[in-house]
């Protein structure tokens, strides 16, 4: 089961144009978002360390997302 709250994930799908969403679809998207988010976070940590920082900044996240 995904750790992300399901309601916001459902809103993301609704904002994309869906009228109805199954619980399985919400869970599947939440799982994928968590996996991708963790990949981006790990890359952002590497970028911050490379820059000599312990703090991950928004720019690290943005660069990591573009890189992946």
Swiss-Prot record:
Q: Which UniProt keywords apply?
A: Chromosome, Cytoplasm, DNA-binding
Residues under site feature: Interaction with DNA: 14
Q: Which Gene3D superfamilies match?
A: Histone, subunit A (1.10.20.10)
What InterPro entries does the annotation carry? Archaeal_histone_HMF (IPR050947), CBFA_NFYB_domain (IPR003958), Histone-fold (IPR009072), HmfB-like (IPR050004), TAF_TATA-bd_Histone-like_dom (IPR004823)
Question: What superkingdom heads the lineage?
Answer: Archaea
Q: Which Pfam families match?
A: CBFD_NFYB_HMF
Q: What are the recorded GO MF terms, alphabetically?
A: DNA binding; protein heterodimerization activity
Q: Which family does it belong to?
A: Belongs to the archaeal histone HMF family.
Q: Where is this region: Interaction with DNA?
A: 20-22, 54-57
Name the major location: cytoplasm
Q: Which SUPFAM superfamilies match?
A: Histone-fold
Q: Which SMART domains match?
A: TAF (SM00803)
* The protein's role, per its UniProt record: Binds and compacts DNA (95 to 150 base pairs) to form nucleosome-like structures that contain positive DNA supercoils.
Q: What PANTHER family does the record point to?
A: ARCHAEAL HISTONE A
Its quaternary structure?
A: Homodimer or heterodimer with HmtB. Dimers then assemble into higher oligomers, with the DNA wrapped around the protein core.
Q: Which gene encodes it?
A: hmtA2
- Subcellular location per the Swiss-Prot or TrEMBL entry: Cytoplasm; Chromosome
- Name of the protein: DNA-binding protein HMt-1.2
**Which GO cellular component terms are attached?**
chromosome; cytoplasm
């Amino acid at each position: 089961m995904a750790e992300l709250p399901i309601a916001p994930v459902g809103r993301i799908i609704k904002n994309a144009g869906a009228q109805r969403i199954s619980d399985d679809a919400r869970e599947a998207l939440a799982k994928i978002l968590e996996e991708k988010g963790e990949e981006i976070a790990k890359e952002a940590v590497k970028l911050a360390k490379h820059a000599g920082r312990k703090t991950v900044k928004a720019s690290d996240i943005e660069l990591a997302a573009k890189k992946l």
